[in-house]
Swiss-Prot record:
Native source organism of the sequence: Autographa californica nuclear polyhedrosis virus (AcMNPV)
The keyword Transmembrane helix appears for this protein: no
Protein name in the entry: Probable DNA-directed RNA polymerase catalytic subunit
Gene3D superfamilies per record: DNA-directed RNA polymerase, subunit 2, domain 6 (2.40.270.10)
Keywords from the UniProt entry: DNA-directed RNA polymerase, Nucleotidyltransferase, Transcription, Transcription regulation, Transferase
Reactions catalysed: RNA(n) + a ribonucleoside 5'-triphosphate = RNA(n+1) + diphosphate
Complex and partners: Interacts with LEF-4, LEF-9, and p47.
InterPro entries named in the record: DNA-dir_RNAP_su2_hyb_sf, LEF-8, RNA_pol_bsu_CS
Domain of life: Viruses
Role noted for this protein: Component of the viral DNA-dependent RNA polymerase which is composed of four equimolar subunits of LEF-4, LEF-8, LEF-9, and p47. Plays an essential role in late and very late gene expression.
GO molecular function: DNA binding; DNA-directed RNA polymerase activity
PROSITE patterns linked: RNA_POL_BETA
Family (UniProt): Belongs to the RNA polymerase beta chain family.
Entry EC number(s): 2.7.7.6
Amino acid sequence: MTDVVQDFNELYDRIENKYKLKYTFDCATNSNERMLFCAIQERKSYLCCALNEQLSCVMHKCVPVIFGTRLDKQFRETDDVDANNNINGTFMLDGRFLSFPNIMMNNNVLVHNFYDKLYAKHCKRMFLYGNVDQEKHINRAIQLVYDKQDDVLFARDVYASDYVVTEDLNSVLETYLANSGKWKPLDFLFEYNTLHKQQLVEHIKIIMNHDINYSIDSLANKIVYKHAYLIELLLTSTILQNYQRVLDKTADDDAYTVANKRRKIQSVLYNKESKKIVDCIVNGRLIYCVSKTFSKQRKVFPNQQDNSSNNNIEISLPVLKYRVGNEVARITNDSMRQKMLKQKKDFVKFIGSFFHGEMTVAGKKFFLCRNACLPNVDYEMVAQKFQYLLKHNLVAFVDDLNDVQDDSLLIAFNDRPTNLKCLKSNTSFIVYTMKRNMAPIELKITDRILYVNHHEGMICIKKKLRVNNEADINVLLTPYEYHYKHSIYYNPIIQCTIVENDDVKSLMSKLEQYYYRNFIHLFHTTPVPKLIVSLTNLKNAMPVFEYKEENCVSGLPNGYSVAVNKSILLNNKMFKLWTLVRDNKLMTAEDPYIPHIALPICLYNNKVNKLKGKLVVGPKQSCLVKFTNSSDKNYVALDDGLVLYMAGVLVSNAKINWVYDGRRYKIETCTNGNFNVYKVYVYFRQIKNQKIEKLDASMVVNGDNVMLKIVIVTSTNDLEGIKICGIHGQKGVFNRSEDLTEWMAEDGTHAQICLSPVSFLSRQSNFDKIERKYVVRGGNHDDPHAKRYPIFNIPYMLFNNTPDNIFKEFIKTSHTGHEKVEGTRFDQWTKNQSFVGNRMSESLHWMRGGSNLPQNCGEFNVVSSLLMCNNTIMKN
């Protein structure tokens, strides 16, 4: 679980304090006035400026303002939109809400396995960063490849020139290690004495000699980058490091010369760079800050959409609670796609086990488990821990590699050789010091080396650790520490054990725990395919809100939404209905539900149409445009199932070319003197029991572009044909409604919806731990012979005919979302599922007895081996 708002608040503070900057919404006005939400939505995007003490704009309209952060509170007046829609953690571009997922990639900070035609498969590789060029701000890298079988080290630098590995390489390695440019506070670990400097090649061989006992697809070999970390890298590499150099130079110069050189007030210092940052944010390509390979791939394969595609996720309101900040997206390319779908065993308890996102990108999107977190990088904290160990003599300096005894361990930091060693007997104290206070530091151990790792993109899980069987501390463990048998905590000599107290919740994300709060038992009692149906429909579910008589229409989300009575509201996606398992005249065949004639549910449809046009004017001509919307008596029902809405009249002294297909809109044109008059009509569909709640039209003119925004809000209480899904993953559509008040409980509660008995049995559902009452048909509970039937208070979701819906290939036109779709599909998969599944067991009996012999025939053995996917148990 990561908190995006907290991460960004810390980032804003860090930048402000380090570079002495002040944030303002617009450097041109520099006013402190707070804006309304609608004003931000009308602007291009929600990005702000950062001014220095001379009031020059350092970062010009390129700092993203994340909703819910302190910057957002500084610039915007809070309103009801926040509370109802969970928008915290999202950002806004072009009036759309977006979130950025955590990005998972292979870990190239530590020693790792790799595939390269030049080297054998068993070789291991490490990149040493260092040899920093302050002038050009380049952090060069050298690639070390180690072949364990021949005990040979190969080295090549970024210019692909291979070094011959001789004694001379020691001095090159020292240059890279001593000045990593990545973890400055820890540079004292890499100050070697004269003798040790000559042994660096040997030292690195010892480190790289240990076996990597996890595969390239394991979570132990992954790092996950957070949104805030990538934004910080982008701002720093594009603008802030250049600005820092200017600051350093200014500090060196004399104060008088600075006064003469001072720029004029309100200038923008880095206009081009700021535009580059905005492009990067808009195109969702933050990952290029980390990996140069991706930007190269884009140039080489312009059509390869995978890595160069936009990672921003557009979000429709209201946002699923706890979704933002917990989504993880894998970066894959087409050749890797199939392999990457695998989830290795060490994903368990770190990455949610149930919700694997859409079918189209299966294996690419995940959610973090509730106890998993992505800690921030803090090399200062690690440096303090090493200083503490030195002060208390728990570690000592290495003078000569050959002097290190068998009772000692060399210490490596991020798989780099350091100048420290420790006694094996002190290991548990070192574990206690390093791991306490939930420090995100990974520890590994071999017979010669203690590995201490702390780098960007670590993924950790919160656990309790018992040290020396006496002290319990709360710690953060990495996948390697928690899952692998070679982990330091499964080593009996170290005497550190993990205290376990987990149930099925440890496999779930916070999002799932919130929406399935009182129904967690479903996750270990219901078949997994049904859970996936339930979770996928939760994602596509229509927003649910409490019905209020007054002002129900004002804050509606776009598209369909559901207003329900407060008594049945569960959360912003679910409501409860009393459910009776029964059928009537086969109305529930093929999975429909029979609803009660009067449910406390109202369906709203908020449709926003944007009609665009271009004024035909010369480059410097001005133009008059006026729009009058028709406020009353402005619609008429037509015979063909449509409603015609007269939106209004637009008058202009220039001609307008409208962009429309002539189907949804009708525009009548005429001229009046020098003016062009346009009457705009809009068609929309009639549905049963439709009530027109709001019709509105307004105009925005920007340069020579004209846009009419037309809002149509309708509601209906007729739910026939709408898709519904129960919390158990039983989906269907509403059939014709019936009066269900005859199924009455003693307290006056009656059934509200009927579930198909066949569906209930075949889905292996169970209604354990769900509120139930007993009803009698006719409601006469005094009759002792009257049969009692249970009704269950089950949560339901209504969901849309989404465009990527399975049925789209059969029903080409989904006009209202009320079209019935069950029973339309009869392709190979459906035939196989329904026909073969139900007949297979019968035909097996026939085959088994077909030869009239006591032994099973070969045909029976072959066909019974195909019974993998059916819930069939065979008894001899």
